[in-house]
Amino acid sequence: REIQPRALLLENVRGLSMPRFAGYRQHVLDRLNEFGYSAEWQQIEARQFGVPQLRPRFVLIAMQHRYFHSFNWPKPQGEAPTVGETLRDIMKRKKVFDDDDALNAWVKLANRPAPTIVGGSKKHGGADLGPTRAKLAWKDMGVDGHGLHDDDKPYSRNDRSITALGPKLTPEMVARLQGWDDAEFSWDFEGRKTAKYRQIGNAFPPPVAKALGLAIFNALNAANAPAAMPENSAIKSAVDPIYRVLRDSGEYMTVADIANKSEAYVNELEVARRINLLSRDFDIEEKERDGLISYRLGGFRAFTGQQDHSRHEIFEKNRSRIS
Protein backbone atom coordinates (compact mmCIF):
# COMPACT_ATOMS: atom_id res chain seq x y z
CA ARG A 1 0.00 0.00 0.00
CA GLU A 2 2.85 2.41 0.82
CA ILE A 3 5.40 1.45 -1.84
CA GLN A 4 2.92 0.52 -4.60
CA PRO A 5 5.15 -1.86 -6.59
CA ARG A 6 3.90 -2.66 -10.06
CA ALA A 7 3.96 -6.40 -9.32
CA LEU A 8 4.06 -8.78 -6.37
CA LEU A 9 4.92 -12.48 -6.12
CA LEU A 10 4.24 -14.59 -3.02
CA GLU A 11 4.66 -18.34 -2.62
CA ASN A 12 3.44 -20.80 -0.02
CA VAL A 13 2.99 -24.53 0.49
CA ARG A 14 0.43 -26.52 -1.47
CA GLY A 15 -1.85 -26.81 1.56
CA LEU A 16 -3.01 -23.23 1.06
CA SER A 17 -4.78 -24.36 -2.12
CA MET A 18 -7.18 -26.60 -0.19
CA PRO A 19 -10.90 -25.70 -0.05
CA ARG A 20 -10.53 -25.08 3.67
CA PHE A 21 -8.58 -21.89 2.84
CA ALA A 22 -10.93 -20.54 0.14
CA GLY A 23 -12.11 -17.69 2.35
CA TYR A 24 -8.55 -16.92 3.44
CA ARG A 25 -7.39 -16.72 -0.18
CA GLN A 26 -10.28 -14.51 -1.19
CA HIS A 27 -9.62 -12.17 1.74
CA VAL A 28 -6.08 -11.70 0.42
CA LEU A 29 -7.42 -10.99 -3.08
CA ASP A 30 -9.98 -8.56 -1.69
CA ARG A 31 -7.33 -6.61 0.19
CA LEU A 32 -5.06 -6.47 -2.84
CA ASN A 33 -7.97 -5.24 -4.94
CA GLU A 34 -8.56 -2.45 -2.42
CA PHE A 35 -4.94 -1.41 -2.93
CA GLY A 36 -5.29 -1.33 -6.72
CA TYR A 37 -4.08 -4.80 -7.69
CA SER A 38 -5.45 -7.66 -9.75
CA ALA A 39 -4.29 -11.04 -8.48
CA GLU A 40 -4.52 -14.75 -9.07
CA TRP A 41 -3.44 -17.92 -7.25
CA GLN A 42 -2.03 -20.97 -9.02
CA GLN A 43 -0.27 -24.18 -8.05
CA ILE A 44 3.16 -24.57 -9.65
CA GLU A 45 5.06 -27.87 -9.88
CA ALA A 46 8.80 -27.23 -9.67
CA ARG A 47 9.68 -30.44 -11.52
CA GLN A 48 7.86 -29.09 -14.60
CA PHE A 49 10.50 -26.36 -14.77
CA GLY A 50 13.60 -28.52 -14.59
CA VAL A 51 13.87 -28.87 -10.79
CA PRO A 52 14.49 -32.55 -9.88
CA GLN A 53 12.25 -32.41 -6.83
CA LEU A 54 8.65 -32.98 -5.78
CA ARG A 55 8.03 -29.38 -4.80
CA PRO A 56 4.48 -28.19 -5.46
CA ARG A 57 4.05 -24.57 -4.44
CA PHE A 58 1.04 -22.30 -4.34
CA VAL A 59 1.90 -18.97 -5.93
CA LEU A 60 0.17 -15.60 -5.88
CA ILE A 61 0.86 -13.08 -8.64
CA ALA A 62 -0.53 -9.57 -8.14
CA MET A 63 -0.09 -6.65 -10.51
CA GLN A 64 -1.50 -3.18 -10.79
CA HIS A 65 -4.75 -3.42 -12.76
CA ARG A 66 -3.39 -1.91 -15.98
CA TYR A 67 -0.70 -4.60 -16.28
CA PHE A 68 -2.47 -7.75 -15.16
CA HIS A 69 -4.45 -8.15 -18.38
CA SER A 70 -1.15 -8.90 -20.15
CA PHE A 71 0.01 -11.51 -17.62
CA ASN A 72 0.15 -15.18 -18.60
CA TRP A 73 1.31 -17.97 -16.33
CA PRO A 74 4.45 -19.69 -17.69
CA LYS A 75 3.92 -22.99 -19.48
CA PRO A 76 5.54 -26.16 -18.07
CA GLN A 77 8.90 -26.92 -19.66
CA GLY A 78 8.85 -30.71 -19.38
CA GLU A 79 9.85 -33.20 -16.72
CA ALA A 80 13.06 -32.74 -14.73
CA PRO A 81 15.97 -35.20 -14.55
CA THR A 82 16.12 -37.75 -11.75
CA VAL A 83 18.12 -37.44 -8.53
CA GLY A 84 20.71 -39.86 -9.89
CA GLU A 85 21.13 -38.00 -13.17
CA THR A 86 21.34 -34.66 -11.37
CA LEU A 87 23.97 -35.69 -8.82
CA ARG A 88 26.05 -38.11 -10.90
CA ASP A 89 28.87 -35.66 -11.63
CA ILE A 90 29.15 -34.45 -8.02
CA MET A 91 29.13 -38.03 -6.68
CA LYS A 92 31.88 -38.92 -9.15
CA ARG A 93 33.98 -35.86 -8.33
CA LYS A 94 33.74 -36.52 -4.60
CA LYS A 95 34.58 -40.22 -5.09
CA VAL A 96 31.58 -41.33 -3.09
CA PHE A 97 31.51 -44.73 -4.81
CA ASP A 98 34.37 -47.16 -5.32
CA ASP A 99 34.06 -47.34 -9.11
CA ASP A 100 31.86 -46.39 -12.06
CA ASP A 101 29.84 -49.59 -11.81
CA ALA A 102 28.81 -48.74 -8.24
CA LEU A 103 28.05 -45.16 -9.25
CA ASN A 104 25.94 -46.27 -12.22
CA ALA A 105 24.04 -48.71 -10.01
CA TRP A 106 23.22 -45.88 -7.59
CA VAL A 107 22.14 -43.56 -10.44
CA LYS A 108 19.80 -46.31 -11.63
CA LEU A 109 18.40 -46.71 -8.11
CA ALA A 110 17.87 -42.95 -7.64
CA ASN A 111 15.60 -42.84 -10.67
CA ARG A 112 12.94 -40.37 -9.45
CA PRO A 113 12.57 -36.78 -8.23
CA ALA A 114 13.71 -35.88 -4.73
CA PRO A 115 11.20 -35.37 -1.93
CA THR A 116 10.57 -31.75 -0.98
CA ILE A 117 13.71 -30.14 0.48
CA VAL A 118 12.34 -28.53 3.64
CA GLY A 119 15.34 -26.67 5.07
CA GLY A 120 13.94 -26.21 8.56
CA SER A 121 14.41 -23.11 10.70
CA LYS A 122 15.87 -22.07 14.03
CA LYS A 123 12.58 -23.07 15.64
CA HIS A 124 11.61 -26.08 13.54
CA GLY A 125 13.96 -28.74 12.22
CA GLY A 126 17.68 -29.15 11.64
CA ALA A 127 20.16 -30.46 9.10
CA ASP A 128 18.42 -33.58 7.86
CA LEU A 129 16.39 -34.31 4.76
CA GLY A 130 12.92 -33.90 6.18
CA PRO A 131 10.24 -35.80 8.10
CA THR A 132 9.94 -39.57 8.36
CA ARG A 133 8.21 -40.17 5.03
CA ALA A 134 10.86 -38.12 3.22
CA LYS A 135 13.66 -40.11 4.87
CA LEU A 136 12.00 -43.34 3.73
CA ALA A 137 11.87 -42.01 0.17
CA TRP A 138 15.56 -41.14 0.36
CA LYS A 139 16.32 -44.61 1.70
CA ASP A 140 14.64 -46.14 -1.36
CA MET A 141 17.02 -44.08 -3.51
CA GLY A 142 20.13 -45.18 -1.63
CA VAL A 143 20.59 -41.96 0.36
CA ASP A 144 20.90 -41.56 4.13
CA GLY A 145 18.53 -38.71 4.93
CA HIS A 146 19.36 -38.51 8.65
CA GLY A 147 21.92 -35.77 8.26
CA LEU A 148 24.22 -33.88 5.90
CA HIS A 149 27.90 -34.22 5.08
CA ASP A 150 30.26 -31.24 4.87
CA ASP A 151 31.14 -29.99 1.39
CA ASP A 152 34.85 -29.79 2.15
CA LYS A 153 35.33 -33.23 3.72
CA PRO A 154 36.00 -36.51 1.90
CA TYR A 155 33.52 -39.37 2.13
CA SER A 156 34.30 -42.27 4.43
CA ARG A 157 32.41 -45.04 6.18
CA ASN A 158 34.47 -44.26 9.28
CA ASP A 159 32.76 -40.89 9.88
CA ARG A 160 29.30 -42.16 8.86
CA SER A 161 29.13 -39.92 5.82
CA ILE A 162 28.35 -43.24 4.13
CA THR A 163 26.12 -45.67 6.04
CA ALA A 164 24.22 -48.84 5.27
CA LEU A 165 21.49 -46.63 3.81
CA GLY A 166 23.88 -44.89 1.42
CA PRO A 167 25.80 -41.60 1.32
CA LYS A 168 24.61 -38.46 3.05
CA LEU A 169 24.17 -35.47 0.79
CA THR A 170 26.21 -32.27 1.02
CA PRO A 171 24.82 -28.72 0.83
CA GLU A 172 26.20 -28.53 -2.73
CA MET A 173 24.15 -31.57 -3.70
CA VAL A 174 21.01 -30.24 -2.04
CA ALA A 175 21.49 -26.92 -3.83
CA ARG A 176 21.68 -28.77 -7.15
CA LEU A 177 18.41 -30.54 -6.33
CA GLN A 178 16.85 -27.16 -5.52
CA GLY A 179 17.72 -25.88 -8.99
CA TRP A 180 21.13 -24.25 -8.61
CA ASP A 181 23.72 -25.41 -11.10
CA ASP A 182 27.19 -24.35 -12.14
CA ALA A 183 26.06 -22.67 -15.35
CA GLU A 184 22.96 -20.46 -15.34
CA PHE A 185 22.31 -20.36 -11.59
CA SER A 186 25.02 -20.11 -8.95
CA TRP A 187 25.20 -18.73 -5.43
CA ASP A 188 27.64 -18.68 -2.53
CA PHE A 189 25.85 -19.85 0.60
CA GLU A 190 27.19 -18.52 3.89
CA GLY A 191 27.84 -20.34 7.16
CA ARG A 192 28.25 -23.96 8.17
CA LYS A 193 26.34 -26.85 6.67
CA THR A 194 23.15 -26.39 8.74
CA ALA A 195 22.98 -22.67 7.93
CA LYS A 196 23.61 -23.39 4.26
CA TYR A 197 20.95 -26.07 4.22
CA ARG A 198 18.36 -23.70 5.68
CA GLN A 199 19.16 -21.07 3.08
CA ILE A 200 18.83 -23.62 0.29
CA GLY A 201 15.72 -25.40 1.53
CA ASN A 202 13.79 -22.22 2.30
CA ALA A 203 14.60 -20.62 -1.06
CA PHE A 204 12.37 -20.53 -4.12
CA PRO A 205 13.90 -22.76 -6.85
CA PRO A 206 15.77 -20.50 -9.30
CA PRO A 207 14.39 -22.08 -12.50
CA VAL A 208 10.82 -21.54 -11.28
CA ALA A 209 11.64 -18.02 -10.13
CA LYS A 210 13.08 -17.27 -13.57
CA ALA A 211 9.99 -18.56 -15.38
CA LEU A 212 7.64 -16.53 -13.20
CA GLY A 213 9.92 -13.49 -13.29
CA LEU A 214 9.98 -13.51 -17.09
CA ALA A 215 6.19 -13.81 -17.19
CA ILE A 216 5.90 -10.76 -14.93
CA PHE A 217 8.54 -8.90 -16.95
CA ASN A 218 6.67 -9.56 -20.18
CA ALA A 219 3.41 -8.28 -18.71
CA LEU A 220 5.02 -5.12 -17.36
CA ASN A 221 6.69 -4.44 -20.69
CA ALA A 222 3.83 -5.37 -23.00
CA ALA A 223 3.89 -3.15 -26.08
CA ASN A 224 0.25 -2.14 -25.71
CA ALA A 225 -0.48 -1.90 -22.01
CA PRO A 226 -4.27 -1.96 -21.54
CA ALA A 227 -6.21 0.76 -19.83
CA ALA A 228 -7.13 0.43 -16.18
CA MET A 229 -9.54 -2.44 -15.60
CA PRO A 230 -12.82 -2.12 -13.70
CA GLU A 231 -12.32 -3.10 -10.08
CA ASN A 232 -14.74 -6.02 -10.13
CA SER A 233 -12.98 -7.64 -13.09
CA ALA A 234 -9.69 -7.75 -11.24
CA ILE A 235 -10.25 -10.98 -9.35
CA LYS A 236 -10.19 -14.20 -11.33
CA SER A 237 -9.61 -16.94 -8.76
CA ALA A 238 -12.46 -19.13 -7.58
CA VAL A 239 -13.86 -18.13 -4.22
CA ASP A 240 -15.86 -19.70 -1.44
CA PRO A 241 -19.47 -18.73 -2.27
CA ILE A 242 -20.42 -18.67 1.41
CA TYR A 243 -17.60 -16.27 2.20
CA ARG A 244 -18.74 -14.04 -0.66
CA VAL A 245 -22.37 -13.94 0.53
CA LEU A 246 -21.38 -13.11 4.11
CA ARG A 247 -18.79 -10.56 2.99
CA ASP A 248 -21.17 -8.74 0.65
CA SER A 249 -24.04 -8.74 3.12
CA GLY A 250 -22.34 -7.46 6.25
CA GLU A 251 -25.52 -8.42 8.12
CA TYR A 252 -26.66 -11.38 10.21
CA MET A 253 -28.00 -14.18 8.00
CA THR A 254 -29.52 -17.58 8.71
CA VAL A 255 -28.18 -20.71 7.05
CA ALA A 256 -31.26 -20.76 4.81
CA ASP A 257 -30.72 -17.12 3.81
CA ILE A 258 -27.09 -17.81 2.95
CA ALA A 259 -28.00 -20.86 0.86
CA ASN A 260 -30.62 -18.86 -1.05
CA LYS A 261 -28.23 -15.96 -1.74
CA SER A 262 -25.39 -18.15 -2.95
CA GLU A 263 -24.81 -18.19 -6.71
CA ALA A 264 -23.52 -21.76 -6.45
CA TYR A 265 -25.98 -24.48 -5.48
CA VAL A 266 -25.27 -25.43 -1.86
CA ASN A 267 -27.62 -27.03 0.62
CA GLU A 268 -27.95 -25.94 4.22
CA LEU A 269 -25.70 -28.74 5.50
CA GLU A 270 -22.91 -27.55 3.18
CA VAL A 271 -23.44 -23.96 4.31
CA ALA A 272 -22.99 -25.02 7.94
CA ARG A 273 -19.81 -26.94 7.04
CA ARG A 274 -18.30 -23.98 5.24
CA ILE A 275 -19.15 -21.60 8.06
CA ASN A 276 -17.23 -23.92 10.36
CA LEU A 277 -14.23 -23.77 8.01
CA LEU A 278 -14.42 -19.99 7.77
CA SER A 279 -14.43 -19.76 11.56
CA ARG A 280 -10.80 -20.91 11.56
CA ASP A 281 -9.71 -17.72 9.79
CA PHE A 282 -12.47 -15.23 10.62
CA ASP A 283 -14.52 -14.24 13.62
CA ILE A 284 -18.01 -15.59 12.88
CA GLU A 285 -20.51 -13.67 14.97
CA GLU A 286 -23.70 -15.49 15.99
CA LYS A 287 -27.10 -14.21 17.06
CA GLU A 288 -30.22 -16.18 17.95
CA ARG A 289 -33.68 -14.95 17.02
CA ASP A 290 -36.96 -16.88 17.07
CA GLY A 291 -35.04 -20.10 17.65
CA LEU A 292 -32.80 -19.62 14.58
CA ILE A 293 -29.07 -18.90 14.60
CA SER A 294 -27.89 -16.09 12.32
CA TYR A 295 -24.28 -15.51 11.29
CA ARG A 296 -22.22 -12.46 10.35
CA LEU A 297 -18.65 -12.34 9.05
CA GLY A 298 -16.35 -10.61 11.52
CA GLY A 299 -12.68 -9.74 11.48
CA PHE A 300 -9.82 -11.67 9.90
CA ARG A 301 -7.93 -13.64 12.55
CA ALA A 302 -5.77 -16.06 10.57
CA PHE A 303 -2.02 -16.32 11.08
CA THR A 304 -0.13 -13.17 10.15
CA GLY A 305 3.03 -13.78 12.19
CA GLN A 306 1.63 -13.84 15.73
CA GLN A 307 3.97 -15.55 18.21
CA ASP A 308 1.04 -16.85 20.28
CA HIS A 309 -1.00 -18.23 17.35
CA SER A 310 -2.42 -21.76 17.72
CA ARG A 311 -0.67 -22.86 14.50
CA HIS A 312 2.60 -23.26 16.41
CA GLU A 313 1.11 -25.91 18.69
CA ILE A 314 -0.47 -27.68 15.72
CA PHE A 315 2.88 -27.64 13.90
CA GLU A 316 4.67 -29.24 16.85
CA LYS A 317 2.10 -32.04 17.09
CA ASN A 318 2.26 -32.80 13.37
CA ARG A 319 5.81 -31.88 12.38
CA SER A 320 6.76 -35.48 11.47
CA ARG A 321 4.10 -35.41 8.72
CA ILE A 322 4.81 -31.92 7.42
CA SER A 323 6.91 -31.35 4.29
What does each model-identified segment do?
Residues 1-140:
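Class I S-adenosyl-L-methionine
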Residues 98-323:
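C-terminal target-recognition/interaction regions appended to catalytic cores
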